[in-house]
Amino acid sequence: MDSVNSFKGYGKVDEAQDLALKKKTRKRLLLLSISVVVLIAVIIAAVVATVVHKNKNESTPSPPPELTPSTSLKAICSVTRFPESCISSISKLPSSNTTDPETLFKLSLKVIIDELDSISDLPEKLSKETEDERIKSALRVCGDLIEDALDRLNDTVSAIDDEEKKKTLSSSKIEDLKTWLSATVTDHETCFDSLDELKQNKTEYANSTITQNLKSAMSRSTEFTSNSLAIVSKILSALSDLGIPIHRRRRLMSHHHQQSVDFEKWARRRLLQTAGLKPDVTVAGDGTGDVLTVNEAVAKVPKKSLKMFVIYVKSGTYVENVVMDKSKWNVMIYGDGKGKTIISGSKNFVDGTPTYETATFAIQGKGFIMKDIGIINTAGAAKHQAVAFRSGSDFSVYYQCSFDGFQDTLYPHSNRQFYRDCDVTGTIDFIFGSAAVVFQGCKIMPRQPLSNQFNTITAQGKKDPNQSSGMSIQRCTISANGNVIAPTYLGRPWKEFSTTVIMETVIGAVVRPSGWMSWVSGVDPPASIVYGEYKNTGPGSDVTQRVKWAGYKPVMSDAEAAKFTVATLLHGADWIPATGVINQLS
C-alpha cells in the first residue's frame, strides 16, 4: 500500500445544483425594523413566490401566494441540497403544521436526532457479526461519533430553547448552530472515512457487507444533517444580505449555559502567568505531584463543569495515550515548556488502529486550553497515519505548544480552534481536519519523509458547502525541519469543498513553485474548493508558477482574505481575548 494514498478522497460534486440553490436564496426585500421571526417569514414568502414564478415562466411579478404550512415547508427545504428528504421527513411530524421557520428548523433537528437514535446501536450489532479486528475498530469509531453527534444535537436544541426566552435568535447563536451542525456533518464523514480506510489493507474490505450496511443506514441522517445546516446557513445569509443588524451578545465558553464570570477574570489575569497559578491537580512522574500520569489527572476532571479545572504537568516524558471525552468542559492543561513537558504515544494505522484513534492526545470537551506542552507520536514515517493531537473542542486555544509526528500529525477535527505560537512538524497531510481553525505565529516545519513520499502541509476536509469550517495559516513561518529534499507543497484539497488560505506568512524555499498539489495525480480538484494566498513573503511565496485551479486564487483581495481572520472565521472577538492569549483579530 502506497502510504500517500490515504483514506481521504473526493466525493461527487453537483455544482449546478448548488448554484441553483444559492440563486434561490439571494432575494432583496424592503423592510423596516421587524422581528427576526417575521423577517424570516417574509423571506420564505419571497422564495415561494420566486419558485412559483419560475415554474409558471412568468415575465412579470405577481403577489406572493398565501403563506401556508405547506408552502413554508417547501420554501424552507428549497434552500437545502436534499429538498425531497427535507420535505418528506419534516412533514411526517405531527407538529409540522406551522408557518414558523424557527419551529420548522427545530423539527429538522428532531428528524436528525430520531434517525441517529434509531441506528445508534447498529455499529455494536454489526461488530458482533465479524471477527476482523480492523472492522470492529472502524465500527467502534462510528459508534463513538454517532454518540457525539447525538449529544451535540441535543445541546443544540437546548440552546435554541434557551434563546427563545429572549424572543430572538441572535447572529452569534446562529453561528453556534452552524458550527455544531457543521461538526455533526464532520462526524458522519469521519465515520465513512474510517470505513473507507480499511481498503488500504485488504481489497476485500471494499465489498464488505458490514461496512456497506452501516453506510446505507447512515445515508438518511447524513442528508438530514445537511438539510438542517442549509436552513440555518441560508437564514443567516438572507439576514446578512439585507444588512439587518442583529444584537450580538457577549458570551464565553459555556455557550448555551451561563458561564461563570470567574473564568474571564481568572483567565485574563493568570493564563500567561502560570508560575503563580495554583492547579487543581499536579502531574509528576517522579512522585512529587498529586498523581503520576496525565490520565489520572483527567479522571479527576468533573463532568460538564462551568468553572475552569486546571492541570499542571511537570517536566518529563509521559508515555501514554490521553482521551478527554465530550463531558470534560473548560479544562486547562499546562506544562513547563513544549520541550520539557512531553506526552508521547506511538499508535498508528499500520499496526491496526483507525486513524481517528491513533492520537497521542485527543480532546472533545469544549473550552479547552493547552499551554507549554509538547505532544508527539513516535510511530515514524513507515507506520503511515499516526496522529499526535486530535481536537474536536469548540472554543479551544493552544498556546506555545508543539505537535510532532510524520503523516497526519495534527488533526483539528471540528468546531472552532485557535493555535498561537505553536510548532507543527510532519510529512503527509500533517495538518488535516474539518475544524474552523486559525494558526497565528506558528512554526510549520515539513520534514523528510520516506524516499517514495512527498510532503503536503494541509488537507482540509470541508464536505458540505454550508459548513462553517476552513483552515487559515496567518503570520506563520513555513520552513524545513532539517534537510528536506522531498517535493513539498502547501497542501492538497481533501474533499469537494476544501477551504484553505495561507496569508501574511513567510514561506521558505522548501515549498515547490507550484505551491499546491491535487489529491488525485493529474486531476484538478473541483471548482467548489476555496484556496488562496494573501501577502505572503519569503522565497517560496512567488505565485507566478502556482497551479491554475478554478477554485484557487493566487492573489486574494483584502475583502477575500478578511473572511479568514480570527475575527471572521472564528468570531474570535467574542471569546479569544478572554483567554488572555496574544492574538490579532484581523
UniProtKB/Swiss-Prot annotation:
Substrate binds at T355, Q385, R492, W494. Acts in the modification of cell walls via demethylesterification of cell wall pectin. Demethylates protein phosphatase 2A (PP2A) that have been reversibly carboxymethylated by LCMT1. Acts as a negative regulators of genes involved in salt stress response. Gene3D superfamilies: Invertase/pectin methylesterase inhibitor family protein (1.20.140.40), Single-stranded right-handed beta-helix, Pectin lyase-like (2.160.20.10). A motif (RRLL cleavage motif) lies at residues 269-272. It comes from Arabidopsis thaliana. One of its GO terms (biological process) is cell wall modification. It is an enzyme of class 3 (hydrolase). InterPro entries: Invertase/methylesterase_inhib, Pectin_lyas_fold, Pectin_lyase_fold/virulence, Pectinesterase_Asp_AS, Pectinesterase_cat, Pectinesterase_inhib_dom, Pectinesterase_Tyr_AS. Disulfide bonds join C422-C442. Keywords: Aspartyl esterase, Cell wall, Cell wall biogenesis/degradation, Disulfide bond, Glycoprotein, Golgi apparatus, Hydrolase, Membrane, Secreted, Signal, Stress response. It is found in: Secreted, Cell wall; Golgi apparatus membrane. This is Pectinesterase 1. Pathway: Glycan metabolism; pectin degradation; 2-dehydro-3-deoxy-D-gluconate from pectin: step 1/5.
